[in-house]
Amino acid sequence: MSANPLDQFKISTIFKLPSIGGYNIDFTNASLFMVLSTLIISLFCYIGLRKENILPNSMQLIIEAIYNFIVSTIESNVGRKGLQYIPLVFTIFTFIATCNLLGVLPLGFTVTSHIAVTFAISMVVFISVTAIGFKHQGIHFLRILLPKGTPGWLAPMMVFIELFAYCARPVSLSIRLAANMIAGHTIIKVIAGFVIKMNIFLTPLPMAFIIILIGFEIFVAILQAYIFTVLTCVYLSDAINEH
């Protein structure tokens, strides 16, 4: 067990691949866990939905619960116009939640602790929302940069501020997710290190505390996926609904 609690976030190469344009594209532990997350989601959906049973199986019930949750989240934040984007929101939620939960497992790796990963997901949301905004509102989508009732003399400054805030969305989304994942796993690692070094008679209480922390980390893993999903829906609302 490494003494440094941050070692768990290190990227390690599993096998090398030829570079492309001078860029390293080796298959790493991060690559492995992202592939695993994708496979788990795909297999889960395939096995759960391959048969239409009168009495749904446990997997189907879970998938339907997630689907209903996504529908409810979209309807409450975007409205019924946003239901056409269920696949986008469903994919984002399940991918982030699965990546987060895999990181809680022993020998797991938390890919969402890396800004490169969370920023890539955030950019998918940012580009998609921007494209959806122009699709639904055309050039009028740019009105998001100038709040109604803004005095003419203040308009240039407000446009600059709103443009900066809009472009900062993927940055804030990615940092929020990565920071929470790093913080939670680091705390667990530090406390686990104390437990190993303590006398055996003093271990039950710290061990119980670790179990509670792991349970809390599972809750945080799902919560962060939920927060990311809700913020995605809020941005979709800006893109679809005229303000």
Swiss-Prot record:
Keywords: ATP synthesis, Cell inner membrane, Cell membrane, CF(0), Hydrogen ion transport, Ion transport, Membrane, Transmembrane, Transmembrane helix, Transport. The chain crosses the membrane at residues 29-49, 54-74, 89-109, 114-134, 144-164, 182-202, 208-228. Disulfide bonds: none annotated. It comes from the Bacteria. GO terms for cellular component: plasma membrane; proton-transporting ATP synthase complex. Its main location: membrane. It is found in: Cell inner membrane. It is a multi-pass membrane protein. InterPro entries: ATP_synth_F0_asu (IPR000568), ATP_synth_F0_asu_AS (IPR023011), ATP_synth_F0_asu_bact/mt (IPR045083), F0_ATP_A_sf (IPR035908). SUPFAM superfamilies: F1F0 ATP synthase subunit A (SSF81336). GO terms for molecular function: proton-transporting ATP synthase activity, rotational mechanism. F-type ATPases have 2 components, CF(1) - the catalytic core - and CF(0) - the membrane proton channel. CF(1) has five subunits: alpha(3), beta(3), gamma(1), delta(1), epsilon(1). CF(0) has three main subunits: a(1), b(2) and c(9-12). The alpha and beta chains form an alternating ring which encloses part of the gamma chain. CF(1) is attached to CF(0) by a central stalk formed by the gamma and epsilon chains, while a peripheral stalk is formed by the delta and b chains. PANTHER family: ATP SYNTHASE SUBUNIT A (PTHR11410:SF0). Key component of the proton channel; it plays a direct role in the translocation of protons across the membrane. Belongs to the ATPase A chain family. This is ATP synthase subunit a.
